[in-house]
Amino acid sequence: MVKNPSFYSVIIGTEILNGRRKDKHFEFLNKELLKRGWEQKASFVIKDDPSFMEDVFNLVKKDENSVMFSFGGIGATPDDYTREVAAKVFSNGIIEQNKKALELIINQFGKEAYPHRVNMANLPKNSILLKNVVNNVPGFGVDERFFFVPGFPEMAQHMVIEALNRFYPKNIKKYSCNFIVHSSENDIIEIMKSLPLDMEFSSLPKFIGDKRIVEIYIADFDKNRVKKWCEFFKSEVDRKGIKKDVLSDDF
């Protein structure tokens, strides 16, 4: 388990990129993370290309705080590359037949588990299993950080919830303020520059008719720090004589 995790999603699906299917994983994962006080650092939608999958997995692995959910490619067909690539990147290329996974597959399919379905029990070394509520063929995780689930949402979603509940149930509370400034971003850039670089900050410009407004969001885990810089920003806006509307003060 990672103490200060950065969450990533890798959605493997040529059929999403060519328009044959719509992605349902990003929105679901985001919702489950936000419910627990987490958020994603990055999300990738990529083709079923083992070389490129390896590059993306290695990129995620370089972040020492990374926690990844990979969707798709863990079935039994020739274009399911995820188990092999995951083993190469996350367990030194070692794949072993997971006895519990094999038992689940045989119990589910009987004689029809052979010769192909049993290959879904060949997992990266020391994998943990994630329950499949649809057909009992498990997803898996490595190092309590890198989780691999099917591309089918009805299977994947329960596994995501299981992994989060087991290993990343809840973050410490994040404090924030959110308000509208009735000006362009250009008018308040100097105020923005005054904020500490390590503070979470975003500005979202919008148009209401022909008028420009900016939605400001400031957040941090330190309550007093958030209060200080939210009040600073608002007071500087007031000093410039610019109207503002407070949406929320959570500190």
Would you name each region that the model predicts?
Residues 51-55, 62, 81-170:
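Proline/glycine-rich low-complexity loops and linkers
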Residues 144-236:
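An accessory alpha-helical subdomain
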Residues 27-89:
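N-terminal small/polar loop signature for handling phosphorylated ligands or for N-terminal nucleophile
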Residues 12-14, 70-78, 219-221:
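Glycine-rich beta-strand-to-loop/alpha-helix junction loops that act as flexible
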Residues 4, 64-65, 211-213:
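A general structural motif
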Residues 236-251:
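Conserved short beta-strand edge segments in small beta-sheet-based binding/regulatory domains
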Residues 2-43, 47-48, 227-228:
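Glycine-rich phosphate/diphosphate-binding loop of Rossmann-like nucleotide-binding domains
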